[in-house]
Amino acid sequence: MRLRITVDIFSGRPNPTVELDGKKARDFLERVKPAKALKRGAMPSPEYRLGYRGLIVEQIRAPSRALPRMFRVAAGAIYGPELAHTIADPELEEFFAGPQGPAAKIKVLPDFSRFMIRQLRQLKEFREDFEPHRQHEPHRPRCLCAPLYEPAWWNDGGQKQWHNNCYNYACNYRTDTFRLTWGGGQPGAASGAMYTALTCAAVGPAAISDGLIANPAAHNRCPKEGHLVALVIAPGIDFHWYRKGRNGLWSHKPGSTPVTNVDNSGHLIPDPRTANRGMYTNFCTFMTVMHGHIKVA
């Protein structure tokens, strides 16, 4: 038996993965066995938020028939086809992220375990405060050159969703390369000038080398041509992009997860500068995407 476990936590860069074999894999599956069904109206799978969104578990060899081949564990619950339950061991994620857990082997950050534990705590706090509510879209000036907000086109649960990230979505440029090839969906990779640090000063120029146009004075106004995007940074950790739609509101795609038009508080996004962006605390700049004049790797 072998499991591939992806820590779904980044938006721009690929998420880290670990693999478990044999007894470790069997023990993990014992701990994630569905226990009690979640109540109707409970928080759904947290795919749409920025920051930690759970563990994506793939059974890649000798799968257990009691569980789907792929499922998500988040904040002590399991989500999958016809699954929305608490798990047998509600402390599983804390163990996974701890110094003796599999996350200790992840080296994408200097202290990934501590970072993951902090993010896990924030997700649980978000879950406890969650209150489902309906969104009413206010009337806003239209951006006639901007793409329509069509989440169903991107959210296919397959190739388009899994292998295009926030940069692909912001640029409205499908490549199907994210997580598959070096530089897939990364600013500057197509032009040979990929960023070398996760800062505004590094990621912004990398995007400009791909053909985006710096537009810091846009102040959330629709450009006369092309469409407006915005770059934000989790310093030293990750980057994220938003795009302004034809309805004047913003939307985004956190990594391989579905496209959404709400922020981490579940609110519509009239301005990304004031949205709840989670760990992406640095608002860098606005840029303009001229259709047909950019390239994404």
Which stretches of residues belong to each language-model region?
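Substrate-binding/catalytic groove segments of enzymes
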Residues: 37-39, 65, 177-181, 237-243, ...
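Residues that flank catalytic or metal-binding motifs in active/ligand-binding sites
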Residues: 51-53, 166, 226, 238, ...
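...with weaker cross-activation on analogous glycine-rich loops/strands in unrelated enzymes
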Residues: 190-257
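Structured segments of extracytoplasmic/periplasmic soluble domains
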Residues: 28-38, 169-176, 206, 210, ...
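Function-determining sites in protein domains
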Residues: 1-134
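N-terminal nucleophile
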Residues: 54-62, 89, 229, 254, ...
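Active-site or metal-binding loop neighborhoods of secreted/extracellular toxin and effector enzymes
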Residues: 103-131, 246-297
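Cysteine-nucleophile protease catalytic domains, especially the papain-like/related folds used
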Residues: 132-213
